[in-house]
């Protein structure tokens, strides 16, 4: 069964919009676990416009499910990972001012850098994942780095879903089969929601994990957090 990791960045965005500690990121994350989430994801950025470094430390102390930290692996991020030692680190090639992740790694061009990162994170006992598009050659390069997993960037799937579902998912099916043949685990994330998730999960073989934040938190405004997580888990209970 594919695991659901809830990204709590949007909770931090809401908190920071007003100041103070409402909503409480830690409490929401723990409630997500209690309601059935199988992991918690955060993506701290240098300007701390949502998740703060202090949040990351607080979450590490309290979480009982897998903790996944995403981010651009600059030296500050690497130091944070060394201190926190999450279960998984997802390397994302974000520019500091980007609104949200919008592309995967060109692994061939960044191969030596990613190899060094994977080796470093493995030395600390951390599972690694490289954020990536569906290009098969790029996935082959990712496997050569020694990474444990890739995370497929799913915004193109979500954007094309209502035009032609089969065509939208096909590159991801091929990417998943190829990655699995190379010994890679497969994660996925970006713009997955209650409308498009089941179709994606049903057709994608070997899908280990999805991380979902924006859509899930938006749905929770109407459905409540517990019911929302239940519905997302149902989409993955294949």
Curated annotation (Swiss-Prot):
It catalyses: 3-amino-2-oxopropyl phosphate + 1-deoxy-D-xylulose 5-phosphate = pyridoxine 5'-phosphate + phosphate + 2 H2O + H(+). 1-deoxy-D-xylulose 5-phosphate binds at residues 45, 50, 100. It holds the Pfam family PdxJ. Pathway: Cofactor biosynthesis; pyridoxine 5'-phosphate biosynthesis; pyridoxine 5'-phosphate from D-erythrose 4-phosphate: step 5/5. GO terms for cellular component: cytosol. NCBIfam families: pdxJ, PRK05265.1-3, PRK05265.1-4. It is an enzyme of class 2 (transferase). Homooctamer; tetramer of dimers. It comes from Porphyromonas gingivalis (strain ATCC BAA-308 / W83). Catalyzes the complicated ring closure reaction between the two acyclic compounds 1-deoxy-D-xylulose-5-phosphate (DXP) and 3-amino-2-oxopropyl phosphate (1-amino-acetone-3-phosphate or AAP) to form pyridoxine 5'-phosphate (PNP) and inorganic phosphate. The keyword Ribosomal protein does not apply. One of its GO terms (molecular function) is pyridoxine 5'-phosphate synthase activity. It comes from the Bacteria. Its EC number is 2.6.99.2. The record marks 151 as: Transition state stabilizer. Its main location: cytoplasm. This is Pyridoxine 5'-phosphate synthase. Keywords: Cytoplasm, Pyridoxine biosynthesis, Transferase. 3-amino-2-oxopropyl phosphate binds at residues 7, 18, 191, 213-214. PANTHER family: PYRIDOXINE 5'-PHOSPHATE SYNTHASE (PTHR30456:SF0). The active site is at residues 43, 70, 190.
């Amino acid at each position: 069964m594919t695991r659901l990791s809830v990204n709590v960045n949007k909770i931090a965005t809401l908190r920071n919009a007003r100041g103070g500690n409402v909503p409480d990121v830690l409490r929401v994350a723990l409630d997500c676990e209690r309601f059935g989430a199988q992991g918690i994801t955060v993506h701290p950025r240098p300007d701390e416009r949502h998740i703060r470094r202090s949040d990351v430390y607080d979450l590490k102390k309290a979480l009982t499910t897998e903790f996944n930290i995403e981010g651009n692996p600059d030296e500050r991020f690497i130091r944070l990972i060394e201190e926190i030692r999450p279960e998984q680190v997802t390397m994302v090639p974000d520019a500091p001012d980007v609104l949200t992740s919008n592309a995967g790694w060109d692994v061939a061009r960044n191969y030596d850098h990613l190899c060094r990162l994977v080796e470093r994170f493995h030395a600390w006992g951390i599972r690694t994942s490289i954020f990536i598009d569906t290009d098969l050659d790029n996935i082959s390069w990712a496997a050569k780095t020694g990474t444990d997993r890739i995370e497929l960037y799913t915004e193109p799937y979500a954007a094309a879903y209502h035009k032609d579902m089969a065509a939208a998912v096909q590159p991801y099916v091929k990417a998943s089969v190829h990655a699995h043949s190379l010994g890679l685990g497969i994660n996925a994330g970006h713009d997955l929601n209650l409308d498009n998730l089941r179709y994606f999960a049903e057709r994608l073989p070997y899908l280990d994990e999805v991380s979902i934040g924006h859509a899930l938190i938006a749905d929770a405004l109407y459905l409540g957090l517990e019911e929302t997580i239940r519905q997302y888990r149902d989409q993955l209970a294949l």
